[in-house]
């Protein structure tokens, strides 16, 4: 079957299945060859490890006269042969051993290696595929700093260009249609996992987890295809650089119709531009949202800035006084408001005295004198309130300084600190009570004054009505 192409009368999906089976058989043969190489390498490492352990273990033997008892232990590691110096793979670090490597002091048997390779196998692999070539220990030509991921990830970064043609094949055997694919939960090769000419990817290896979906990732036809994406050839250019692959076919990165469906979208992962996606997910809302949001933001900018162009209300005199320095406020009140109010009050009073001497006092001049007198009293009250605020603030600052005195030179224990703060809080409460009493007194006075004014107006209205009634009679 591997030497013949699929019949032309088959549907694209059937042709895809036939090509997958052919590629699967090729990968099985490659896996058998790599397993044999693995066994040979394991035997060599095991022999080297046993020899290394024997050279490091003291032996109970008779020493000839004149020789030191520990002369047979004087062989240093730097004097041994190169085979004894490499009991482990160069990629196996001290704290990050590769899954397929043999740790020192614990030689593994072929059965144990088969068990380890079986554990590294994806869940979607069929039963005959027991081992994965991804668990093969990397060669000694790889630098020691390339051991950050699983062994299959290490193999993605090493090797030569001899197996570069395998990158065009699916990365893992096809499982039954409808079964869940462990590639979804396993790993996804990003654009960086598309192998460069100097890298080799073993068939069936799992890409690095958390990375972007690579063009080389393979998905099940039953779980990733949609009816609308099975017919037309979907040839997309990968965005991974010169190493990316275009089109599809027997050696393409993705089979025809293997569009990425929404059901296989991994949480927290994004798709590379070269990955094929379903028509419903080729243009996700997230890729369309930024331009409208930017446009709407630019449109909403002038609209939101329009209210700022409206001229703000000018603050009244009371608001200006609240944000001023109290000392400056008192100075302005004394130098300007107080003087003007005194002059105005004296002027109105002089006019009333002149009219009184003449014997005819105008009601309008009397009201103006009352208004000038009220203004003078208001200025005096404002000065008194501001000076009181300044003095009370100075007292509070002095009390607060006593609470934190000598704090920079020495630490105050908890009890003394609580006592000082409690005293300050009590004194602050007394001042607050004084303010509350003053406000309540002013409020009650204003209420009484308004009630009296209303009562006086009612009496005046009744008198006018009575006078009108008498005149009418």
UniProtKB/Swiss-Prot annotation:
Q: What subcellular locations does the record give?
A: Nucleus
In this chain, the stretch annotated as Disordered covers 1-319, 444-473
What role is this protein assigned? Answer: Component of the Mediator complex, a coactivator involved in the regulated transcription of nearly all RNA polymerase II-dependent genes. Mediator functions as a bridge to convey information from gene-specific regulatory proteins to the basal RNA polymerase II transcription machinery. Mediator is recruited to promoters by direct interactions with regulatory proteins and serves as a scaffold for the assembly of a functional preinitiation complex with RNA polymerase II and the general transcription factors.
Segments crossing the lipid bilayer: none
Protein name as annotated: Mediator of RNA polymerase II transcription subunit 29
The similarity annotation says: Belongs to the Mediator complex subunit 29 family.
Query: What cellular component terms from Gene Ontology apply here?
Result: mediator complex
The source organism is Caenorhabditis briggsae
Biased amino acid composition, Low complexity: 13-50, 111-123, 130-139, 272-286, 294-308
Note the subunit structure: Component of the Mediator complex.
Residue ranges under compositional bias (Polar residues)? Answer: 1-12, 51-62, 148-183, 255-269
**Keyword terms, alphabetized:** Activator, Nucleus, Transcription, Transcription regulation
Q: Which InterPro entries match?
A: Mediator/Homeobox_domain, Mediator_Med29_met
